[in-house]
């Protein structure tokens, strides 16, 4: 059964957030165990609100390649843009977010490292989330097992739908996990963070730590790691807020 919808603001908007420029463009980046279609429910709501939404097909090979794919999408935007990342792609948002077109950053249950920070070492300061034990490797390519995907990644998604999502997950290359950001866009740009309180992929307390450290305007959503699918109205609303359309 899907979790009840809860979106609780836990931090007041920072001065930076209040000064964010209005935008009509949104670039969305997916993380591990997913593909660009994971944003479909959010995109439909953004388009209905008059936003121009672009979902990046993240290659999941190296951090540099993922940032380059996102940069290509940013290059196509015609003005101020909100850059949104889920899960691993918070790394990409942190790096690519320095682009001058990007006026605000949104992290959805996402990694948010500082420049040159070892994210793995940071994550080890918190209890390990169950999903990591479910990664299955074929040579240097990893993906979640079906059991781990249904239980630890998409726990509040109806099983039939979660199985479809499992089938379209893109494998990721081992080298991707060793990449480090060289910039931290959140240090200079307004940031928002959606914590997933029922997350079994990234520890919710780690999410809270990263959100607080960056001074992000933060909400807590009672959702699995896939709040963008189980609670798309909340995530779309957060994006519209960051874009100045709330």
Descriptions of predicted regions:
Residues 1-16:
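N-terminal export signals
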Residues 19-79, 129:
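Active-site catalytic motif of lipid deacylating hydrolases and related acyltransferases
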Residues 29-31, 86-87, 110, 196:
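Glycine-rich His-Gly loop
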Residues 84-85, 89, 93:
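Gly/Ala-rich beta-loop-alpha elbow adjacent to hydrolase catalytic centers
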Residues 101-146, 173-180, 210:
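Flexible "cap/lid" loop of the alpha/beta hydrolase fold
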Residues 140-185:
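Conserved alpha/beta-hydrolase catalytic His-Asp/Glu region
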């Amino acid at each position: 059964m899907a979790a009840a919808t809860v979106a609780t603001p836990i931090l007041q908007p920072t001065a930076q957030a209040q000064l964010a420029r209005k935008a009509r463009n949104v670039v969305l980046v997916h993380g591990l165990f997913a593909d660009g279609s994971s944003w479909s429910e959010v995109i439909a709501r953004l388009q209905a609100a008059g936003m121009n939404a672009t979902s990046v097909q993240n290659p999941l090979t190296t951090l540099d390649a993922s940032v380059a794919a996102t940069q290509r999408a940013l290059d196509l935007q015609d003005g101020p843009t909100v850059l949104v990342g889920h899960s691993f792609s918070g790394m990409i948002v942190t790096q690519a977010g320095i682009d001058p077109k990007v006026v605000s950053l949104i992290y959805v249950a996402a990694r948010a490292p500082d420049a040159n920070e070892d994210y793995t070492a940071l994550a080890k300061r918190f209890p390990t989330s169950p999903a990591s034990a479910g990664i299955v490797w074929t040579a240097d390519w990893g993906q979640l097992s079906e059991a781990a995907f249904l239980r630890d990644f998409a726990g509040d998604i109806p099983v039939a739908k979660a199985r479809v999502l499992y089938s379209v997950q893109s494998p990721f290359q081992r080298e991707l996990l060793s990449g480090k950001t060289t910039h931290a866009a959140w240090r200079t740009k307004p940031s928002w963070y959606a914590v997933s309180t029922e997350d079994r992929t990234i520890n919710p307390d780690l999410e809270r730590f990263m959100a607080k450290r960056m001074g992000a305007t933060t909400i807590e959503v009672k959702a699995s790691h896939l709040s963008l699918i189980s609670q798309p109205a909340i995530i779309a609303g957060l994006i519209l807020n960051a874009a100045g359309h709330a």
